[in-house]
Amino acid sequence: MAKGQSLQDPYLNALRRERIPVSIYLVNGIKLQGQIESFDQFVILLKNTVNQMVYKHAISTVVPARSVSHHNNNHHTTPTEAVENVETQAE
């Protein structure tokens, strides 16, 4: 398992398991909304009124509608923190 997967998979799995609505921003600026139905190494299946298969390489940011209780030192990530983390990584 790649180093990046060790954070990505548990985070996406928590979003899927808890059925947390997400906004997914693509690199071209398009915003998609829905719930994560499933995911693998390359794609996320997003469910709303229809199912959409979104390629991860096209995703800029994933923003949950509420806190995510993934098991990363018992830290709950809020939507604001998620955006701040992305902005910090971009600098």
UniProtKB/Swiss-Prot annotation:
GO molecular-function terms, A-Z: RNA binding
Gene3D superfamilies assigned to the protein according to its UniProt record, in alphabetical order: 2.30.30.100
GO cellular component terms, semicolon-separated: cytosol
All copies of domain Sm, residue ranges: 9-68
Ranges for region Disordered: 68-91
Alphabetical keyword list: RNA-binding, Stress response
SUPFAM superfamilies: Sm-like ribonucleoproteins
InterPro entries assigned to the protein according to its UniProt record, in alphabetical order: Hfq, LSM_dom_sf, Sm
Signal peptide positions on this chain: none
Superkingdom, taxonomy of origin: Bacteria
Keyword Magnesium among UniProt keywords: no
GO biological process, alphabetically ordered: regulation of DNA-templated transcription; regulation of RNA stability; regulation of translation, ncRNA-mediated
Family the entry assigns: Belongs to the Hfq family.
Binding partners and assembly: Homohexamer.
Function, in words: RNA chaperone that binds small regulatory RNA (sRNAs) and mRNAs to facilitate mRNA translational regulation in response to envelope stress, environmental stress and changes in metabolite concentrations. Also binds with high specificity to tRNAs.
Entries under NCBIfam families matching the protein: Hfq, PRK00395.1
Protein name: RNA-binding protein Hfq
Organism of origin: Haemophilus influenzae (strain PittEE)
Lineage per the UniProt record: Bacteria, Pseudomonadati, Pseudomonadota, Gammaproteobacteria, Pasteurellales
Gene, per the UniProt record: hfq
